[in-house]
């Protein structure tokens, strides 16, 4: 058996045994299939997230089985519940500590728009301080809706390049800075 025979495996050509691609497609595949969520739960949406993580819905099937309670080890933050003005700087600091690329899912009516709490102490939407990627409607949203948001984020990650993602986030942050004055704790 010579070197020329190595290119032919029994019943297969060498081209059938190789998977060709570039490094960015491998990174997109990895990012899309292994998200490390940081649940920032402040209200009833946090209880629904717990249901999502349990065996009935099993968030592990979607590659997000390892919740991280350290922002430096997370790449996705789920904002679950009402955010007050006193809590907003803490949430922003947690977001800033996360490694790039980072993703934000706003879960429930309270996180997305302040919900039924239209008061002076409640932030009327987390998108005033963070660049939100996906909104999950509901009060509280069902676990299926949270899983749907996770699948949509994974699809977005698998189809969008890293440079396009970086430009999108920088544009969102610039819009946030132009639209909002510095956040003042009341």
Curated annotation (Swiss-Prot):
Q: What is its main location?
A: membrane
Q: Gene3D superfamilies in the record, alphabetically?
A: 3.40.50.12280
- Keywords recorded for this protein, A-Z: 4Fe-4S, Cell inner membrane, Cell membrane, Iron, Iron-sulfur, Membrane, Metal-binding, NAD, Quinone, Translocase, Transport, Ubiquinone
Cofactor(s) needed by this chain: [4Fe-4S] cluster
- Residues bound to [4Fe-4S] cluster: 44-45, 110, 139
Q: Which Pfam families match?
A: Oxidored_q6 (PF01058)
Q: Which GO terms describe its biological process?
A: aerobic respiration; electron transport coupled proton transport
Main function: NDH-1 shuttles electrons from NADH, via FMN and iron-sulfur (Fe-S) centers, to quinones in the respiratory chain. The immediate electron acceptor for the enzyme in this species is believed to be ubiquinone. Couples the redox reaction to proton translocation (for every two electrons transferred, four hydrogen ions are translocated across the cytoplasmic membrane), and thus conserves the redox energy in a proton gradient.
Please state what the protein is called.
Answer: NADH-quinone oxidoreductase subunit B
Q: Which organism is it from?
A: Leptospira borgpetersenii serovar Hardjo-bovis (strain JB197)
């Amino acid at each position: 058996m010579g070197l020329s025979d190595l290119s032919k495996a029994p019943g297969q050509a060498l081209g059938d045994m190789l998977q060709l691609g570039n490094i960015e497609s491998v990174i997109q595949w990895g990012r899309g299939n292994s998200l490390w969520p940081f649940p920032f739960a402040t209200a009833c949406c946090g209880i629904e997230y717990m249901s999502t993580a349990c065996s009935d819905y099993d968030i592990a099937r979607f590659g997000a089985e390892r919740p991280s309670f350290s922002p430096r080890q997370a790449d996705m933050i789920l904002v679950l519940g009402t955010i007050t003005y006193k809590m907003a700087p803490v949430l922003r600091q947690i977001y800033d500590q996360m490694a790039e690329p980072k993703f934000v899912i706003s879960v429930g009516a309270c996180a997305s728009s302040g919900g039924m709490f239209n008061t002076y102490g409640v932030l009327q939407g987390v998108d005033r301080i963070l660049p939100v990627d996906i909104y999950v409607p509901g009060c509280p949203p069902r676990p299926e809706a949270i899983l749907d948001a996770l699948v949509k984020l994974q699809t977005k990650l698998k189809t969008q390049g890293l440079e396009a993602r970086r430009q999108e986030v920088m544009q969102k942050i610039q819009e946030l800075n132009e639209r909002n004055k510095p956040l003042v704790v009341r």
